[in-house]
Amino acid sequence: MTQPLLQLTGITRSFTAGDREFLALKNINLTINAGEMVAIIGASGSGKSTLMNILGCLDYATAGSYRINGQETRDLDDQALAELRRDYFGFIFQRYHLLPHLSAMHNVEMPAIYAGIPAPQRHARARELLARLGLDGHLTHRPSQLSGGQQQRVSIARALMNGGEVILADEPTGALDTASGKEVMRILLELHAAGHTVILVTHDPKVAANAERIIEVSDGEILSDRRNQRDTGQLSDEEQVPAKPPATRRLVASLGLFKEAFNMAWVALISHRMRTLLTMLGIVIG
């Protein structure tokens, strides 16, 4: 029997406000196999975002078991959980979450920097991803120079940088116009066809209809889990996104990571000269 990629058993997540406890998730049991395309749908406050955060190792469950490819996450410390998140997951957010002072290339490279992948391989991988997503002419553009659809394609490339075995897409078309939203969904369908596990988190039935399995969440509980018949779109051979990065050893030591962080910080300072000057004056003058 094939081992599930993601397996949640009896997952509960509670939050405390003052002397009151709020249950965001209640005894969730869910299995997602490798290569599935799943939509988690629910209204605002349904618990779908909390479920996504636990699936993506962005949060801990209060109770229950969560296994990723058989590995129990319950007792992992923050560092171990971050490494698991880095190795398995790529994230696509509604508001893109790109660093405004960095180019498209540098934004895409960020996950690989934290993974310790050498610069030449990072650069080649980022260029390849952006080119396949139609952004080869925008490598040096900052987010403010890109349209919403282009920014979301940069975030997709970033999600794939370390392989993105599981793509977690939180309202991926929510901030886009109709045409850009369709293009983003077409890319996600292609990634699914290439073997990625794709999990959509949405309130929109039209977005959920792209998945082969739809899970409805309400008041922290799973109301239904059903298969869905859908039509799929394909990218042309020229547009297909490379599914996995080339095999590499993670050779960059902590000194190299410090150098990269320093370079990023320097770019941020140069990009905001006036703010930097005023800050320095405030320090000097007191």
Kindly label every feature range from the protein language model:
Residues 102-111:
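Short coil-to-helix segment of the ABC ATPase nucleotide-binding domain corresponding to the Q-loop/switch region
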Residues 167-170:
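Catalytic Walker B motif of ABC-type/P-loop ATPase nucleotide-binding domains
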Residues 71-72, 113, 120-137:
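Conserved ABC ATPase "signature" region
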Residues 142-152:
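Conserved ABC ATPase signature
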Residues 64-72:
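Conserved ABC transporter NBD signature motif
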Residues 56:
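Helix-to-loop junction immediately C-terminal to a conserved catalytic motif
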